[in-house]
């Protein structure tokens, strides 16, 4: 925005005010409507398909996604994270896991996944960049005191996002065990509403499907969501030499009303710093 933009806005505002005094205000254009069911069905030969009615979950997902994309101005930021140090630390921690007795015999007390460490890194980053740990409301900005990280979990017929509350205060082992428990109960649709409603941000990971990078839709009232791609060996240039490193691409979607581009970049840089120096997640 420059001086000319401000002057034009002032002039336009004055002209608009004068016009609205002279006549009725212009009506807001109607939102475009999707194709009707009849219009869609006419495109296909009768008998060439089966019409499966939507269940309540699919209807809710559709409504929430339309709401998110039509009311939230999405802004996207992407960068690569080297994860060799993270993978080494994960192996070291898993190898050191104490054994505990279970119904099926002895088993490790925890088994960390890369996604568990991503959840913790996102929580750490939000604590380092607290202005990005926010939610937009028309009356003001909600500044959250803790990082409640939602994690997208695919379930039969849809998607749900259980939330790791106060992930900034929890250890990696607690996050890991909590996520495993909620993921199992999510797939059997046994989560309590308070376990998937709310939250301050979310993580969506499609790396297990080999997806390199993608962008995710923000889940209101969140102002951010992190899309995580697959970790893979890639050539990198370090000190003028080509080397091979394990690299993971991440894309941060932000609600531009709450998190401007520079603030989102600061948050993503803090996430990258934590992922590439993972010992910081242990203190």
What is each residue range found by the language model?
Residues 5-283:
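C-terminal catalytic/motor cores of large multi-domain enzyme assemblies
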């Amino acid at each position: 925005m420059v001086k000319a933009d401000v002057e034009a806005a002032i002039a336009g505002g004055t002209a608009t005010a004068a016009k609205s005094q002279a006549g009725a205000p212009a009506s807001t254009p109607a939102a475009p409507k999707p194709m009707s069911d009849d219009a869609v069905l006419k495109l296909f030969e009768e008998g060439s398909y089966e019409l499966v009615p939507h269940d309540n979950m699919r209807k809710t997902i559709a409504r929430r996604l339309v709401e998110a994309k039509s009311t939230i101005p999405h802004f996207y930021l992407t960068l690569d994270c080297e994860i060799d140090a993270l993978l080494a630390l994960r192996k070291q921690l898993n190898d050191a896991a104490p054994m505990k007795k279970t119904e099926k015999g002895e088993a490790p007390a925890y088994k960390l996944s890369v996604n568990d460490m991503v959840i913790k890194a996102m929580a750490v980053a939000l604590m380092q960049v607290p202005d990005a740990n926010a939610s937009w409301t028309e009356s003001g900005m909600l500044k959250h005191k803790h990082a409640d990280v939602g994690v997208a979990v695919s379930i039969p017929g849809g998607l749900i996002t259980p939330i790791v509350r106060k992930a900034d205060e929890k250890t990696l082992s607690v996050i890991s065990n909590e996520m495993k428990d909620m993921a199992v109960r999510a797939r059997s649709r046994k989560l309590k509403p308070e376990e998937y409603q709310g939250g301050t941000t979310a993580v969506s990971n499609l790396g297990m499907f080999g997806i390199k990078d993608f962008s995710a839709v923000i889940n209101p009232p969140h102002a951010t969501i992190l899309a995580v791609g697959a970790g893979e060996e890639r050539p990198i240039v370090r000190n003028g030499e080509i080397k091979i490193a394990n690299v993971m691409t991440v894309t941060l979607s932000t609600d531009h009303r709450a998190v401007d581009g520079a603030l989102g970049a600061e948050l993503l840089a803090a996430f990258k710093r934590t992922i590439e120096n993972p010992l910081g997640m242990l203190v």
